[in-house]
């Protein structure tokens, strides 16, 4: 079986019974189940949700996204072998640890296959909830350019690249393009302040102003749980992005939950602690792939400058990356997933066929 065949690159064409268009994101696709199938599975599987709660099948792919573009390799390699299974395994591990530590639930109800989650439909909070323990990435670039205010937070003089911040900082940005919010540009992934959120909490999809403090509490607590666990395997949790949303429990009560993925190499920076102590930055995250791209192309400004998005999209579309660059990130993702979970990540010979068989035989969702 070739590498290209082991990669699940297209994940929005599965014959799952649905009555709505499939939502296809950069990495995951979402299939909204019919009311009948949702109600049947809730009853058959005993999910702890309201009997009429809408459910969805969420299928991850092995696609690799960076700088808001999807990249591919030579020889028809459309993704990173093992990436999807590694990401899901890591998120599953952290969500369980959150629950064990008395934090909030997630949207995941069932895990039929390493690439598949059955989830409860949530009302998303329209914020990328970012938390930073070290100054690096976009925050460092802004600081190096002389900026001393970041997301409304005053930064002290004398900070050094890749060093620990004086405090754990929450630096939110917008999720999607939000229109009509005073002081917030109508663009994707724009940095915002806490005051922006407080003044316009309904526009960011919070049910109440009090929930802002709850989201901040869950963000910090979740960050600290993962950070402490990673310390035990000689890794540093540098920064991360969480997402939150609202669901209703079986009694009909609304609750704020974690959603999407948490603590993965896609949504976080994770550094090797021993290498860091020796003065080296060794990435166990997608940041290594981002750095490869910045070094691979002669004009890295195309990747960093949002005004040059058409050029960037053409760069991703027209360039076959070396296979070894994708295999490097494969080894990184599988390696950190196995360290975190303590379990092997096995590559499927034909993930799409496996998913269809399981969803047909065990869930009755394939026509």
From Swiss-Prot:
Q: Which GO terms describe its biological process?
A: 'de novo' IMP biosynthetic process
Q: Does the keyword Cytoplasm apply?
A: no
**Database matches in InterPro entries:** SAICAR_synt/ADE2_N, SAICAR_synthase_Vibrio-typ, SAICAR_synthetase_CS
Q: Which UniProt keywords apply?
A: ATP-binding, Ligase, Nucleotide-binding, Purine biosynthesis
GO cellular component terms, alphabetically, are: cytoplasm
Keyword flag Zinc: no
Reactions accelerated catalytically? 5-amino-1-(5-phospho-D-ribosyl)imidazole-4-carboxylate + L-aspartate + ATP = (2S)-2-[5-amino-1-(5-phospho-beta-D-ribosyl)imidazole-4-carboxamido]succinate + ADP + phosphate + 2 H(+)
Q: What is its EC number?
A: 6.3.2.6
Pathway-wise, it operates in: Purine metabolism; IMP biosynthesis via de novo pathway; 5-amino-1-(5-phospho-D-ribosyl)imidazole-4-carboxamide from 5-amino-1-(5-phospho-D-ribosyl)imidazole-4-carboxylate: step 1/2
Q: Tell me the GO molecular function terms.
A: ATP binding; phosphoribosylaminoimidazolesuccinocarboxamide synthase activity
- Extent of the signal sequence: none
Q: What class of enzyme is it?
A: ligase
Similarity remark: Belongs to the SAICAR synthetase family.
The name this protein carries in UniProt is Phosphoribosylaminoimidazole-succinocarboxamide synthase
Q: Which organism is it from?
A: Vibrio parahaemolyticus serotype O3:K6 (strain RIMD 2210633)
List the taxonomic lineage.
Bacteria, Pseudomonadati, Pseudomonadota, Gammaproteobacteria, Vibrionales
The record's gene field reads purC
